[in-house]
Amino acid sequence: AYKAAYLTSALVKLHASVEVVMTRNATEFIAPLTFEQLTGNKVMVDTFDRNFVHQVEHIALADRTDLVMIAPATANVCAKLAHGLADDMLTTTVLACTCPKLIAPAMNTHMYENPVTQDNLDILRRYGWEVIAPASGRLACGAVGAGKLPEPQDLLQYILREIAFPHDLKGK
């Protein structure tokens, strides 16, 4: 979870406007307050929060988003997005986004290598997502293998490349 905070900090230092959306499960790993302090923006978790500025906040957020980066992305989030399930603030917002999307899966090696997870990542690729391969090494569960979230500076390079080299002429 600390890597997401470091990535957020690096983006803010580059004067990016960063808005963080977290799942309820993500808040068990790192407090939303961490990201609020780093970005100066309210972290969005609850789709039905009555303190939003806009009546339909996930649509307003999707409309003003230039790039989506989901890091780390659990197998659950990958599956939801691959199959169009929108049952929380993250998935409803992202499904409404028309901007470029990056996703960095991070999970246990066996979960990552599971054919179902690989199929879901292939679906996301077909829908235009850039899937960032996980790093290998010692995982949070103690196992060693593929499944680690890449280092923040590596994730930042994907973001900068996407911003610097838009794919407007892709396929032409």
Model features per residue range: what roles?
Residues 1-102, 109-171:
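A cross-family phosphate/adenosyl-ligand binding-site feature
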